[in-house]
Every structure is written in structure tokens, then in C-alpha cells.
A protein has these predicted regions:
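Short Gly/aromatic-enriched secondary-structure transition segments
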Residues: 34-35, 195-207, 436-443
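Non-catalytic C-terminal accessory/binding modules of secreted extracellular proteins
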Residues: 143-163, 193-194, 293-318, 390-514
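Extracellular hydrolytic enzyme modules, especially secreted metalloproteases
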Residues: 270, 274-277, 282-434
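Residues that flank catalytic or metal-binding motifs in active/ligand-binding sites
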Residues: 7, 18, 41-43, 64, ...
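Structured loops at beta-to-helix junctions and adjacent beta-edge loops in soluble globular domains
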Residues: 14, 60, 107, 183-188, ...
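Lectin-like carbohydrate-binding module/patch detector with strong preference for beta-trefoil
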Residues: 1-145
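Residue-level detector of buried hydrophobic side-chain packing
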Residues: 22, 66-68, 115, 182, ...
Length: 514
């Protein structure tokens, strides 16, 4: 027997009749209940086809990240919604009784135990036999809606490193295999001495953590392959390091050109790589590690071709962790600095400690918006709410997961051609200087494509504006269960209430008015 999986279904049984429907408890336990029939998301069940004619059963309430399963406690009779996975308790067979109803069994407890309800408490359980509570009627309800696509933001002019569309004639596309070469140079005024190039590379890349972070944050869509040419040793640039000023485009380009000239095409062909990392000794007069972007024909020269995308690693990379390089590579993919150039950097960034592009000292992930902008977040995991709604409910799943709705986007200005939006997602834990992870709850922020890099294009709306030496600025920004975020942006207001936590997911109510 097959079902139309494009619809959601109501499940009622013969014992309790059509006035009671299978539902989910709202207490965070993920347990089931029989509740008075109504238009509730916990009573909208989705059937997801699996192999052998079996189905996973999920609700609109908790979404695709939670599937009907059985608690493995020895008795194995209690159904609940568990994190979706390849588990035998989530493979359900719907067998016709011959009277228009169905028996629901699963692979874990076998064909002898069917979904039933107790005669006294009416709680669902699994039992043997042929009882009226095991005769389930599936009534088709609404067609399952898709997520509304999130539009690109319109910068409204020439905005450098905008949160709007990325110009891939200028930046690297963050997908597929992106190849990078790392070379090492020193200077008459800053010799490398006995510094190991190989050990330096290990530190800069975090012994492979930088590459792994990009692979995980992109859900496997980006593979950053770094070829470390420590075997070529430290090559001496003729000019002193003080002759270069990396904050100036022409001087920055000259430095990369002079460094690349030290390597013959037979040693390394820079044209084979999309990105180039040029490493200087700690003693060089480069306090920072800026990214270099150039349009075709305006890049640095090399014996084997033009270099348009590079990171020149300075002394801060020796004291900072590998996130420093991850941040700079983010610029090569078109992501902006979220902290203000006129402020104190990460210490007072309006995006707080919640993004690698804001705080390299505590953040270990990219915002959901940047995952979306980079094309990493699947379209089904983000949705756009363009119209006013006094009560819109959703269960948000962690961005680090592989399923579920993870990003809500709401326009602040023109809903059809927005330049500024509100974003709602689950906070991704930061790493404290004490080595401990911190941060859970719901994060709310604005994204403005008309604001350039270094001018706070992302602003977190915090529960509490506080700072910690261990966890960073705005470390108490996320909202927890029972807490309410409220903001007014121009003519738009958003009130977001965190209703409940289910595992690592949060159920929220959105009141959006424009």
C-alpha cells in the first residue's frame, strides 16, 4: 500500500474515534499523546517513503529532524519522536486491516507489536493482538508546503564586500575543490632563522582544522586543498619588510609579486592554484594577515601567471589560532568583516562573538546567513516570511545538523527586493579562552546589504548586551525557552517567543508585522 507523500495526514483510531488524534506533547519530552482533534501542527503527520514500502513518520510541529521511533528501554513499548536517522524503529509498515484502517508496526519491535492506545490514559503504546486502538485511519489533510526561497539582498550601489550577491568574477566560488598553495618568504630585516616552515604551516592551518572546518560548515560542498611547500624552504625577498604597506593595494600587490618571483615555474606553478598563502616570519613588519582580492588583469604577477586571490600571513597569525586564516579565506569568498574598522575589533563588534567574520578569538562557525550566501545551506533549510503574520510557528534545527529548518529570514524594507532583513537561527556554540564551549538558544540579527565591510553589516539583537573575557562580546545574546526577543526596524516589528526545546531544536512563535 502506498500513500501520497505530498500530503500530511491525521491519525485517529477506532477505539477513540475521530475526535481524538495522534499528537505530540509540548513539554519537550518528544512523547506522544491522543488529543482533541484540531488544526494543530502536531497532528499533521508526514509520511516519508523509505525502502521496502516502509515510511518514516514526522510531524509538521517538529519537522523532518524528528521521526516516530520506539524508546529502547528493554520493554520497548513506548513510542516517541527521536532524532531522524537510519534506525530500525523509524521504519514503519502500514498494513491494511481490510476495513479501511491500518496496522502500524516497525522494524525494531517487529510485526507482532502494533501502535495502540491504553484504554485508561489513552497514551499511545505498542501492543500485540487485534484491538480497536490498533486500527488507525489516515485522513489526508493539506498538501505539504515548501519553503519560500530567500531572495538575494540588493545593495543599491557599489558596496564593497556586500551581504548581497557575490561577484564571482572578483571572488572565489566557495564550492567544489578550491586549491591553495602556501609558500614561505623572509626578509633582510626579518630572517626566518631556524623557524620551521612545516611547523609554521601546521600552526596556521591548525593541523588540518582549517580545511576540516570549511568542509563541515559547507556540508561537504567545499574542499579546501592546501599544498604546503615547506620543502622549498624560506626564500629571501630582496627588500626589507618595512618597505611594504599591506593596507595599500599597490604595495600589497608588489609584495605578493616580489614573493612569487622567488619561485620558478618548475618548482611551483601558481596558475594551478586559485588561492595563494604567503607566509612571513613573525619578526616581519606585518602585524596583520590581510586578504588580497583583485579583478582579472589587476592581480600580482608571478613567473607562472597572475595571482588574484591571496592571504599574506603576518605576526598575528603566530599568536592567533587557525581561525585567523579561515577568516581571511572567507574574504576571498566575498564575505565581509562584521566588526567595525572604527571600533575595537571583536571587543565591541555588533555581531558579537557569533561569527568567524566578527570574532576570530571565540567563534568557530559562520552565521547561517553566510552559509546561505555561500550557497552551502540547502534551500529547504531556509525560509522567507514576506507577509505579516501574528502567529507563525516553527521548530528550528541546528545549523550543524543535516536536516530541518535552520534559518528564518524576514524583510525589513521592500519584501520583494529587500536590502535589509532580519534573520533567526540557533546559536552555534563559541569556544571560550578557557577551552569550554558556550552558547545555546535562538539568535536574532539584522543583515544590511547597503553597508560595506568593516561598517557592521550584521547587527545581533541581544537578550543581554554583555561581554566576557572568556567568551567574547554579546555572549549572552541568544534567547532561551520562555524568553522573548522584540525589535522594531523602521516600519517592521518582530516578536519572537521561544516556546520549547526538543533535543537540540527549539520551537518558536513569530509575530511579524509590517
Amino acid at each position: 500500500m502506498s500513500f501520497d507523500t505530498s500530503f500530511s495526514y491525521r491519525l485517529t483510531n477506532r477505539f477513540l474515534g475521530p475526535g481524538q488524534s495522534l499528537d505530540v506533547r509540548s513539554d519537550g519530552s518528544c512523547r506522544l499523546k491522543m488529543a482533541p482533534t484540531g488544526d494543530y501542527s502536531g497532528q499533521h503527520w508526514r509520511l516519508v517513503a523509505r525502502s521496502g514500502g516502509r515510511y518514516a513518520l514526522q510531524t509538521s510541529y517538529l519537522g523532518e529532524c524528528f521521526s516516530l521511533d520506539v524508546i529502547n528501554d528493554g520493554t520497548n513499548t513506548t513510542p516517541w519522536l527521536a532524532v531522524t536517522g537510519n534506525y530500525s524503529g523509524q521504519y514503519w509498515t502500514l498494513t491494511p486491516w481490510g476495513d479501511g484502517t491500518y496496522r502500524l508496526t516497525n522494524d525494531f519491535t517487529g510485526p507482532q507489536r502494533s501502535l495502540d492506545t491504553y484504554s485508561d490514559t489513552h497514551d499511545p503504546f505498542l501492543d500485540t493482538g487485534d484491538h480497536s486502538g490498533q486500527h488507525w485511519t489516515l485522513t489526508a489533510l493539506d498538501r505539504i508546503p515548501g519553503t519560500a526561497p530567500v531572495p538575494e539582498l540588493e545593495p543599491g550601489g557599489d558596496v564593497y564586500k556586500t551581504e548581497g550577491p557575490t561577484d564571482f568574477s572578483f571572488y572565489a566560488r566557495p564550492s567544489g575543490v578550491v586549491k591553495a598553495a602556501m609558500v614561505f618568504v623572509d626578509f633582510p630585516d626579518a630572517p626566518a632563522g631556524s623557524t620551521s616552515a612545516a611547523a609554521t604551516a601546521d600552526h596556521l592551518l591548525g593541523n588540518g582544522q582549517a580545511q576540516r572546518l570549511y568542509r563541515e560548515q559547507s556540508y561537504g560542498q567545499l574542499s579546501l586543498e592546501v599544498t604546503v611547500r615547506s620543502d622549498l624552504g624560506w626564500r629571501r625577498v630582496p627588500k626589507p619588510s618595512t618597505s611594504y604597506h599591506l593596507s595599500q593595494f599597490e604595495s600589497h600587490r608588489s609584495y605578493i609579486t616580489d614573493a612569487a618571483a622567488l619561485f620558478q615555474p618548475t618548482e611551483i606553478a601558481f596558475s594551478d592554484y586559485q588561492l595563494v598563502f604567503v607566509v612571513a616570519p613573525r619578526a616581519a613588519s606585518f602585524p596583520l594577515s590581510p586578504a588580497f582580492n583583485a579583478r582579472p588583469g589587476q592581480g600580482a604577477g608571478s613567473p607562472s601567471g597572475e595571482i588574484r586571490l591571496a592571504v599574506t600571513l603576518g605576526s598575528d597569525s603566530y599568536t592567533n589560532r587557525y581561525i585567523n586564516l579561515v577568516h581571511e579565506v572567507g574574504h576571498l569568498f566575498g564575505l565581509p568583516d562584521l566588526y567595525s574598522y572604527t571600533g575595537s575589533g571583536a571587543a565591541d563588534s555588533k555581531a558579537g562573538c557569533w561569527s568567524i567574520m566578527s570574532d576570530i578569538f571565540h567563534a568557530v562557525s559562520f552565521l547561517g546567513w553566510h552559509r546561505h550566501k555561500n550557497g552551502w545551506l540547502p534551500a529547504s533549510r531556509a525560509t522567507y516570511i514576506a507577509d505579516s503574520t501574528p502567529a507563525w510557528y516553527a521548530t528550528l534545527s541546528p545549523l550543524s545538523g543535516s536536516c530541518g529548518l535552520s534559518l528564518l529570514v524576514l524583510p525589513v524594507d521592500d519584501p520583494h527586493h529587500p536590502s535589509k532583513v532580519l534573520a533567526v537561527e540557533l546559536a552555534q556554540p563559541v569556544l571560550g579562552s578557557n577551552g569550554r564551549s558556550w552558547g545555546e538558544g535562538v539568535l536574532v540579527y539584522t543583515v544590511d546589504a547597503t553597508i560595506a565591510t568593516g561598517s557592521s553589516p550584521v547587527v545581533v539583537i541581544p537578550k543581554r548586551a554583555s561581554s566576557s573575557p572568556d567568551y567574547g562580546y554579546l555572549y549572552e545574546a541568544p534567547f532561551g525557552v520562555g524568553e522573548v526577543a522584540h525589535t522594531v526596524q523602521g516600519s517592521v516589528s518582530l516578536t519572537m517567543t521561544v516556546l520549547q526545546k526538543f533535543g537540540s531544536s527549539y520551537n518558536v512563535k513569530v509575530d511579524y508585522r509590517r
